[in-house]
Amino acid sequence: MKRFHSHFNGYSVEFSPFEEQRLACVTSQHFGIIGNGRQYILDVLDRDIGAFKTFDTRDGLYDCTWSEENECHVASSSGDGSIKIWDTQAPSGGRPIKSFEEHTKEVYSVDWNLVTKDTFITGSWDQSIKIWNPRMDRSLKTFREHRYCIYSAIWSPRNAHLFASVSGDRTLKIWDSRDNRSLNTIKAHDHEILTCDWNKYNDKEVVTGSVDKTIRIWDIRYPDRPTTILRGHTYAVRRIKCSPHSESMLASCSYDMSVIVWDRAREQDPIIARMDHHTEFVVGLDWNMFIDGQMASCSWDEQVCVWNLGRPGQFR
């Protein structure tokens, strides 16, 4: 397992959609409560992980996403309500090429549209979701229905207009960006929902993770009950990522300091790997779309970790 010391507390990691060795990571001082933030651009090398570029901010950073149309651009969301676009060709320590400042509270989620490639979406503690084009000065559209902090807003990987959002109000909402109101509201958990993701192979399936320690898989056409409930974490599920290489596999990380890889096709024993390589809350997680089985995580223990599970077939 390769490790990188981030000096600040980790919050999110994402592999580049253009370069297989490149990884973005956002971090915050003092657990994101107060202090500065740092956007890292890292390279996963043969023996270790090296810092390619670093960009500092005056407030903590909570999430990041790579542009789908420019391999040198990455967006990060901040505790001061701003979203910043960075150019990785600029020198370390440089200023963002763009800063959007409409949200009035922390922005906990940012996600680039995989289909149109020219928009991204943000979810904020101000209870709003916004869609942006990086070339425009203002947001394209704002959605307000959630009644508490929004923790995650994620585009469908197959439909240009669909996105999902989850909130502390315990609901999962499905939206069409062309409409002003959500298409569906699912009371998905009995406690706050901290994360969601779409199945990369099934645009009718969304996965949610909650403070109630469970992961629930939903067919959005049949919202009355989840199709599957996965249990294995002992504290809140902080982030979920569906595999880009397998319809039935997903990974989760938790405040129990673990990362679990699941194959829900194995109904009796869905956990295929449990990793306890962190010593604090694990809050960031991603799969490398270029290298089957390669994953990255980041934690409040100031460690960014990259490891390789091998091909998913070996676990079946």
From Swiss-Prot:
SMART domains: WD40. Signal peptide: none annotated. It comes from the Eukaryota. The keyword Methyltransferase does not apply. It holds the Pfam family WD40. Keywords: Cytoplasm, Peroxisome, Protein transport, Repeat, Transport, WD repeat. PROSITE patterns: WD_REPEATS_1, WD_REPEATS_2, WD_REPEATS_REGION. One of its GO terms (molecular function) is peroxisome matrix targeting signal-2 binding. Its main location: cytoplasm. WD repeats lie at residues 56-96, 102-142, 145-185, 188-228, 232-272, 277-316. It is found in: Cytoplasm, Cytosol; Peroxisome matrix. One of its GO terms (cellular component) is peroxisomal matrix. The keyword Transport applies. GO terms for biological process: peroxisome organization; protein import into peroxisome matrix. Interacts with PEX5; interaction only takes place when PEX7 is associated with cargo proteins. Belongs to the WD repeat peroxin-7 family. Receptor required for the peroxisomal import of proteins containing a C-terminal PTS2-type peroxisomal targeting signal. Specifically binds to cargo proteins containing a PTS2 peroxisomal targeting signal in the cytosol. Cargo protein-binding triggers interaction with PEX5 and formation of a ternary complex composed of PEX5 and PEX7 along with PTS2-containing cargo proteins, which is tranlocated into peroxisomes by passing through the PEX13-PEX14 docking complex. This is Peroxisomal targeting signal 2 receptor. It comes from Dictyostelium discoideum (Social amoeba). The lineage of its organism: Eukaryota, Amoebozoa, Evosea, Eumycetozoa, Dictyostelia. The gene is pex7.
